[in-house]
Amino acid sequence: MRSLFISLLLLQLSTLSLSADLQTYYKDFMEAHGYPLEENLVLTDDGYILSVWHLTPKEPNGRVVYLQHGCTDTAWTFFQLGDNSLPFILLREGYDVWLGNVRGNIFSHNHINPELAEVHSGFNEHSMDEMVEYDLPAMINMVREKTGAKKITYIGHSQGTTIFFMLVMHNPAFAEEAIDHYVSLGTVNNIANTLFPPIEILDRIAVIFQKVGIFKYMSLTNAQRNLVAKFCKTSPGVCGKAIDYALSIKPSGRMDYKSLPLFILLSRRCK
């Protein structure tokens, strides 16, 4: 029961919008590590506007790598180990690093149709099928066009691996044409046998919300957001242990608990 409560709390936090401070923080974070962030917008064939991040190496080796985040997540997840984060390691090795944000996460929440707002049912009527059919080809092709690379290396994490497997099955010709190497981190092909009970419960809650016309779940007021952010900032260890406990994770000692408020705020739910 405690695990479910904490998980619901984290899900609630994951629906927050970006404040001005957060919009500048993640850019300042990367620049402080020596790599200014370039944000690119790409339009999918069905009208979604996606954000693709680009970091340029100081000594290029001519190779291009694309990183794709997991479920309820964003490209920001790849930076949670600070200077030892995967993008920074790749940059120091000379790789041209690109990171995609799929539809529905906090960086890719716009649509070409101004009437199709995020709170409207139509915006959220998507699944991994649309990510495979529209998002990945659009983002990968943009990277290829901007870099001139015929093929790039794809690194996926969690759902980022799932949608790549689906891409290979759905459009093998494109995968063969665009990808030269594939790296799978935290591989997931389904969650049918998950040992995390809240997933099934939350799925049922989502169905109920959709039936009654609620399309943006568990948003917080500014007062609630400020309270939680202040608590996590002053007690990062407690927040970190709560996450470890809720997800049954054995603490590794590598996570920067001081960054937890930002990582939680920059996450989003998946479909």
Question: What feature does the model see in each segment?
Answer:
Residues 101, 130, 153-158, 181-183:
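Residue in the alpha/beta-hydrolase core beta-strand immediately N-terminal to the catalytic nucleophile
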Residues 25-57:
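N-terminal cap/lid segment of alpha/beta-hydrolase-fold proteins
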Residues 44, 56-113:
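Short, surface-exposed "cap/lid" segments of acyl-processing enzymes
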Residues 121-145:
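Alpha/beta-hydrolase active-site loop
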Residues 2-19, 115:
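Cleavable N-terminal signal peptides of Sec/SRP-targeted secreted and luminal proteins
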Residues 145-150, 162-271:
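Alpha/beta-hydrolase-fold enzymes
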Residues 69-71, 152-161:
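Conserved alpha/beta-hydrolase "nucleophile elbow" surrounding the catalytic nucleophile
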